[in-house]
């Protein structure tokens, strides 16, 4: 088994977007007794509504990582957003959590968006994984099945965050009220607005409204 600890990458096969599940568990993540509440949730399935205990364990690990990837006050802002804003915000946390998602997004998706062809397919992502494999022994050690699953998971994340059309696989920008982008601008995270596939003139327009 190739050593993972030197690689910045992890597989993303264990947990997809899971918007509603994350929404339900957020109060447990923010609670002062978070650890004991999450342990109880894994055992008793009070809020997650996920039948398998193995899945609950896996999801809780990933939800904790996503929660910790951004400042705690972000989640206070998040709770007051529209559903579309919350979906975008969860995608922001996912980008901050998983380097593979970040690289897929900036090396493949955004290049596609800035080209003539806005269709994003699994093959586009597999090409990026091949590039990563050439420079990262841990990624290179993944089975073809794992690589395919990572690509499928990323595409699911895009669809559920509002960036990829379910039927056509066409990329689509996330358009929100200016107020829902305020956190990113005021926190020096304007790059995320580019990740939402907004053009510079759209970003400037949003800034003038704040």
Residue ranges with predicted function:
Residues 109, 113, 133-139:
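Long, low-complexity intrinsically disordered regions
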Residues 140-210:
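Accessory, usually C-terminal, subdomains that scaffold auxiliary metal cofactors
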């Amino acid at each position: 088994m190739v050593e993972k600890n030197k690689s910045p990458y992890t597989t993303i096969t264990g947990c997809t977007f899971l918007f509603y599940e994350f929404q339900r568990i957020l109060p447990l993540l923010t609670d002062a007794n978070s650890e004991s509440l999450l342990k109880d949730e894994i055992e008793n399935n009070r809020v997650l509504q996920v039948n398998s205990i193995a899945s609950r364990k896996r999801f809780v690990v990933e939800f904790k990582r996503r929660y910790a990837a951004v400042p705690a006050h972000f989640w206070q802002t998040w709770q007051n957003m529209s559903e579309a804003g919350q979906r975008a915000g969860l995608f922001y946390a996912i980008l901050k959590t998983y380097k593979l998602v970040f690289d897929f997004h900036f090396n493949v998706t955004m290049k596609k968006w800035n080209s003539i062809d806005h269709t994003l397919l699994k093959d586009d992502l597999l090409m990026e994984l091949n590039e990563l494999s050439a420079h990262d022994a841990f990624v290179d050690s993944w089975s073809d099945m794992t690589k395919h699953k990572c690509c499928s998971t990323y595409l699911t994340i895009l669809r559920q965050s509002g960036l990829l059309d379910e039927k056509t696989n066409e990329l689509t920008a996330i358009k929100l009220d200016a107020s829902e982008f305020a956190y990113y601008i005021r926190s020096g995270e304007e790059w995320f607005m580019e990740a939402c596939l907004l053009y510079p003139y759209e970003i400037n327009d949003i800034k003038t409204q704040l």
